[in-house]
Regions:
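Bacterial N-terminal signal peptides that target proteins for export
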Residues: 3-20
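A subset of signal/propeptide-processing and intrinsically disordered low-complexity segments
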Residues: 6, 27-28
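Alpha-helical transmembrane segments and their juxtamembrane interfaces
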Residues: 20-21, 123
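N-terminal signal peptide c-region/cleavage motif recognized by signal peptidases
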Residues: 23-25
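N-terminal alpha-helical modules
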Residues: 28-137
Length: 137
């Protein structure tokens, strides 16, 4: 359901944003140059900034595409988005009992690829050639 998707997106985003909110101020002083981070924490700070921007783009692209679709197409898109989120989470994060770990580089790459995918669907729909079969990819 729509509530499940929103809840999943919200919970994932809250976990990442909350982590970022605590990390960013602590590491900002040492990460002036994301080209050459001084240490792993500076690198994580830089990756988190890029991930948060990709996540924002993902939400915007999903919203843009959703506005172009009818009710049935929206349901198909939602199924595809939930499947993509499960795949991203399975491939980019894990919980080993001691904590929850996210590979930010993996999450960022998967998210950027999904943004591109959604933007391709937006272009197709704007051109009058929405392909329903691609909405749940």
């Amino acid at each position: 359901t729509t509530n499940t998707l929103k809840s999943t997106i919200r919970n994932t985003s809250i976990a990442i944003v909350t982590s970022a909110a605590f990390m960013l101020p602590m590491f900002a002083w040492g990460a002036e140059n994301c080209d050459k981070p001084n240490n792993d924490f500076d690198g994580l700070y830089c990756l988190t900034k890029v991930y948060l921007e990709a996540d924002k783009e993902l939400n915007n692209s999903y919203s843009k595409l959703s506005k172009l679709l009818n009710k049935q197409q929206k349901a198909t898109l939602k199924r595809g988005q939930l499947a993509w989120m499960r795949e991203r989470n399975d491939q980019c994060s894990y919980n080993d009992g001691d904590g929850f770990f996210v590979n930010m580089s993996c999450a960022t790459n998967k998210t950027a690829n999904r943004v591109n995918f959604l933007n391709e669907r937006v272009r197709e729909c704007n051109a009058g050639s929405c392909r329903d079969s691609r909405l749940d990819d």
